Amino acid sequence: MPINDQFPSGLRILVVDDDTSCLFILEKMLLRLMYQVTICSQADVALTILRERKDSFDLVLSDVHMPGMNGYNLLQQVGLLEMDLPVIMMSVDGRTTTVMTGINHGACDYLIKPIRPEELKNIWQHVVRRKCVMKKELRSSQALEDNKNSGSLETVVVSVSECSEESLMKCRNKKKKKKRSVDRDDNEDDLLLDPGNSKKSRVVWSIELHQQFVNAVNKLGIDKAVPKRILELMNVPGLSRENVASHLQKFRLYLKRLSGEASQSNDSESTKRYENIQALVSSGQLHPQTLAALFGQPIDNHHSASFGVWIPNDNLGRSQNEHFSVDVSSASNRPVSVAVHGLSSSANFRQRGDVNNNRIRQGYGSNVNEESWILERSSRQR
């Protein structure tokens, strides 16, 4: 949806909730705000709608606890399909652990029922925020492409104001075409030859198989993990070295993308991302060695360690940098609290500088040990 004088009127929202009463109430409140609303009572049906109408929605508002496919699974599928859609979770469950799980899975916000109209009035901010991220990615890709064609080392800066909606869509389609091409090459590597049949069988990376892979990488260390040793530790019949090599490459690119998002964001966004990473470490979902490789810092397996990241501070014209320090321990299991709508709490993170703990309004954390990273290979057969 283009941002014009009428924005946010006409914002296209998909609402998913198995509670029909709550669903109709939300629809009425959103219609009063001049939003275009599509309602759905089942998460799997909502996923089908998103696949068939990829460019028909600007935002998804989903309940957490639903029969069949829950809100977390829907959130993961939206991320795997690379729809670039902000997803807001909502639930009557306001426990810190539940909220943190939603944020770690990639939710940009978490609303606690009953939801007030004031909270729905400003959800358009997440759409604007996501478009700004897309513009930054487009600016970076255009600069790299221009440098490659000209052979010059000069950095080409493209003004954000010059990035029109049409150019954004072209860049988006170009990225999807490249991804499909890479996926086809990877699928060819993942096929196993059957001597008795001319057809090839496909290796599907299920949640359990991916978890074995992650455990093997954590045991070896992300820097020392090679396909041959990972294959020996996994000991899965029918799995080849080429399959593991392809999956390891995707896993490293995923960690690199997390590191890149954290280094390119501003102070507030960086603080939120490192809070999410701290939550993953505290809950045991992210291995310390993997985290160390992500930021290029060594970590002792037998002692608590800390890593520091310099975050540029451009606010208020200050030229100094602020240092953000997070404690990491493989045996740590300290609770992490998050401020959300209607819920007061304090953040248990040790920070240096003037970084404030604001309410988490946007989450970029991902659970590397769970199904949030697993590629849905079956969707590419369509």
Curated annotation (Swiss-Prot):
One Pfam match, given by its short name, reads Myb_DNA-binding
Q: Where is this motif: Nuclear localization signal?
A: 199-202
List, in alphabetical order, the GO biological process terms annotated in this UniProt record. Answer: cytokinin-activated signaling pathway
GO CC terms in record: nucleus
Query: Which terms are listed as keywords in the entry?
Result: Activator, Cytokinin signaling pathway, DNA-binding, Nucleus, Phosphoprotein, Transcription, Transcription regulation, Two-component regulatory system
* Location of this chain's protein in the cell: Nucleus
MF annotations from Gene Ontology: DNA binding; DNA-binding transcription factor activity; identical protein binding; phosphorelay response regulator activity
The domain of life is Eukaryota
Give the DNA-binding residues: 202-252
Q: Residue limits of the Response regulatory domain?
A: 12-128
Say if the entry is tagged with keyword Secreted.
no
Spell out the coiled coil positions from the record: none
Q: How is it modified after translation?
A: Two-component system major event consists of a His-to-Asp phosphorelay between a sensor histidine kinase (HK) and a response regulator (RR). In plants, the His-to-Asp phosphorelay involves an additional intermediate named Histidine-containing phosphotransfer protein (HPt). This multistep phosphorelay consists of a His-Asp-His-Asp sequential transfer of a phosphate group between first a His and an Asp of the HK protein, followed by the transfer to a conserved His of the HPt protein and finally the transfer to an Asp in the receiver domain of the RR protein.
Q: Does the keyword Acetylation apply?
A: no
Annotated positions of the 4-aspartylphosphate modification: 63
Annotated region Disordered: the residues are 171-193
Q: Give the compositionally biased regions (Basic residues).
A: 171-181
Tissue expression profile of the protein: Predominantly expressed in young leaf tissue.
General function of this protein: Transcriptional activator that binds specifically to the DNA sequence 5'-[AG]GATT-3'. Functions as a response regulator involved in His-to-Asp phosphorelay signal transduction system. Phosphorylation of the Asp residue in the receiver domain activates the ability of the protein to promote the transcription of target genes. Could directly activate some type-A response regulators in response to cytokinins.
Q: How does it assemble?
A: Binds the target DNA as a monomer.
Similarity annotation: Belongs to the ARR family. Type-B subfamily.
Name of the protein in its database record:
Two-component response regulator ARR14
Organism expressing this protein natively:
Arabidopsis thaliana (Mouse-ear cress)
